[in-house]
């Protein structure tokens, strides 16, 4: 077989039919220098690398005024959606030191796409304050939110300090939790169907 010099198509993996398979991207957690999260996100965007910085708006009260402030939900961390080539490019930024890895391993920990979609949905549509819980929460009942701004979100119903919360688990990072009335959720089975 003769491969032309500039024909990169032949060097990519192929599926059964022979067409090129797209390079797979995955979500990783990059560790960032303290207070450099927003700047790093801007630089990654300029480089053309998809990234996600979880920011939540909060109202801060002083004696003479109130101000809406953006708060980084996970300090010193930014999510990047990269393939192997972009994974190396991200580390060229001086504000990024490394990727979060699994304990005892050297490969970066991958956050599943479904978890990221649920987490982003929760951040985008929640009216309530989202809290991150790193302490282990007992697995809760699988539920789907049926009312309110989070309608359609699937997660777990957990009880923390007597309050019902919907939790979205993130690999290696714990749970993102938000208060929700128990009447706004319905149980679902493992495959996503309604339970009787």
Language model region names:
Residues 2-142, 157, 162, 167, ...:
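Acidic-enriched and Gly/Ser
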Residues 148-151, 172:
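Short, charged beta-turn/beta-strand-edge "cap" motif at the junction between a beta-strand
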Residues 151-157:
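Short, Lys/Arg- and Gly-enriched loop/turn segments at beta-strand edges
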């Amino acid at each position: 077989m003769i491969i032309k010099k500039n024909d990169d198509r032949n060097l990519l993996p192929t599926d059964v039919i022979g067409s090129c398979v797209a390079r797979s991207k995955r979500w990783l957690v990059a560790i960032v220098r303290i207070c450099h999260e927003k700047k790093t996100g801007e630089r990654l965007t300029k480089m053309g690398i998809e990234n996600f910085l979880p920011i939540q708006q909060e109202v801060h009260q002083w004696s003479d005024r109130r101000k809406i402030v953006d708060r980084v939900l996970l300090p010193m961390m930014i999510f990047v959606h990269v393939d192997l080539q972009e994974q190396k490019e991200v580390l060229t930024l001086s504000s990024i030191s490394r990727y979060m890895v699994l304990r005892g391993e050297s490969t970066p920990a991958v956050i599943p796409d479904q978890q990221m979609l649920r987490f982003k949905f929760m951040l985008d549509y929640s009216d309530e304050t989202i809290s991150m819980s790193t302490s282990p929460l007992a697995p809760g009942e699988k539920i789907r939110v049926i009312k309110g701004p989070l309608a359609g979100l699937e997660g777990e119903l957990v009880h923390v300090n007597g309050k019902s919360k919907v939790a979205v688990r993130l690999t290696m990072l714990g749970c993102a939790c938000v208060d929700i009335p128990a009447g706004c959720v319905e149980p679902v089975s493992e495959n996503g169907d309604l339970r009787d």
